[in-house]
């Protein structure tokens, strides 16, 4: 039987460079969606992903929806 709460959450990761840098090549912010396990990862997720606006690998942090 399934439990009441879903353990996996769909989260959004946002580039930290794009959100802080006003002088960038393109307008916009790089965002990725992924899922995380609520029980195993209680704190905010940080992953190093490729940002097409910055053209480099940067740290993407979990944001609130």
From Swiss-Prot:
Localisation per UniProt entry: Plastid, Chloroplast
GO biological process: translation
Main location: plastid
GO MF annotation list: structural constituent of ribosome
Matching SUPFAM superfamilies: Zn-binding ribosomal proteins (SSF57829)
Keywords on record: Chloroplast, Plastid, Ribonucleoprotein, Ribosomal protein
Pfam families in the cross-refs: Ribosomal_L33 (PF00471)
PROSITE patterns, A to Z: RIBOSOMAL_L33
Any one GO CC term of the record: chloroplast
Family stated for the protein in its record: Belongs to the bacterial ribosomal protein bL33 family.
NCBIfam families (UniProt xref): PRK00504.1, PRK00595.1, rpmG_bact
Identification of the protein by name: Large ribosomal subunit protein bL33c
Organism: Chaetosphaeridium globosum
Source organism phylogeny: Eukaryota, Viridiplantae, Streptophyta, Coleochaetophyceae, Coleochaetales
């Amino acid at each position: 039987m399934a439990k009441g709460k879903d353990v996996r959450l769909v989260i959004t990761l946002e580039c930290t460079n794009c959100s802080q840098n006003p002088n960038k090549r393109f307008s916009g912010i790089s965002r990725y969606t992924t899922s995380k396990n609520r029980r195993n990862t209680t704190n905010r997720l940080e992953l190093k992903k490729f940002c097409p606006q910055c053209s480099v690998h940067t740290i993407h942090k979990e944001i609130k929806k």
